[in-house]
Amino acid sequence: MEHVLSTLSLEFFGKGKHKTTPEIFFAIENGFLLDVRAREEAESIAIKLDHHRNIECKNIPTDEIPDRIHEIPQDKSIAVCCSGMARSAIVYAYLLSKGFKNVCILEGGYATITDALKPGKILKVLQSK
């Protein structure tokens, strides 16, 4: 973890490489959306992205990440999301400390996902198939 912390400089945060938007992330070829909300949150409002075939979604609550880290693919671009960004930031740093390379935080959390899934944006996804 010390190595990860030592890389989090002003330049790192200033360039914004640690975060992405849903629009950018949903357009990549091979993505993995890691939902780190509590199980109860995910059961109440699930994130499925069934029409975004290039993105795999999985809910692994923050407190289960250490025991379930083997379920997170290292060969995909990973975006971590939660209802805000606090848990995402914690899991982001943890994954970096475990050697994951292609990890970022989904900027704005769940609210930006719902905005990115409005009817016009879903229609564009469907028409691009």
Label every model-predicted segment.
Residues 58-116:
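Catalytic cysteine-centered active loop of the rhodanese-like fold, especially the PTP/DSP P-loop
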Residues 1-53, 122-129:
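Flexible, polar/low-complexity N-terminal or interdomain linker segments that lie immediately upstream
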